[in-house]
Amino acid sequence: MCWKIIRTTENNGIKIIYNGIPTAGKCETQTGDATQIGTSRFNESYDDNAYVGYMYGTAGSSTYAATHANTNESTIKKYIDNWYKANFDEIATSKLEDTVFCNDRTTKAYDAKTIGNTSFSSYGDLGYGTNVTFYGAAHRASYYSNDSNPSLVCQNQNDKFTIDNQNGNGKLTYPVGLITLDEVVLAGFNTHDSNISDYKDTTNYLYTNSIYWTFSPVMSAGGNATVGN
């Protein structure tokens, strides 16, 4: 298998992203479907704030905590776990760091300083049910941001997906997950509103000419819970 280094971890390990299989024994820069493990929806349903979660609680709940409880596995988590199980054994797993994969579900209401488009001024920070909500990454590293201000800090224990519960939520079965919008920006993509064509830059380190999911919730509005891709 071919991989690209995303960044170092807090414990001096490295995070890597899948980039296809070798061609003639070499891992050249690849694009298109060959760079993906397959295709999957993030969640089958998307009409509630719950569905921005890699795991989620109860749709239709009247509290943030019940909505974002890590009770149900997302569609994409099941898909990734099945791929991992089919391709890696216990020996390989034992050599991998149990690092944090951050599904940052912190909410932040519209702020003109970070999101200048006033058409979003009604977006709040409730984060449950069908309430129109902005999530943290929308302000830091999304198409809607005035500027990029990525962060590798995962604020909530509930959002830190790990196998062990000492440095995270202990909800992962395998040490695998998704890249975040913040990591995408730090790798060179400018996803903010003033430079929306940057994702087409073929010289960018993470360019694949394919759309791929990230871990980062962006918003929930109009019956659509949106995760960055």
Question: Can you name each region flagged by the protein language model?
Answer:
Residues 1-229:
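Long, domain-scale functional regions
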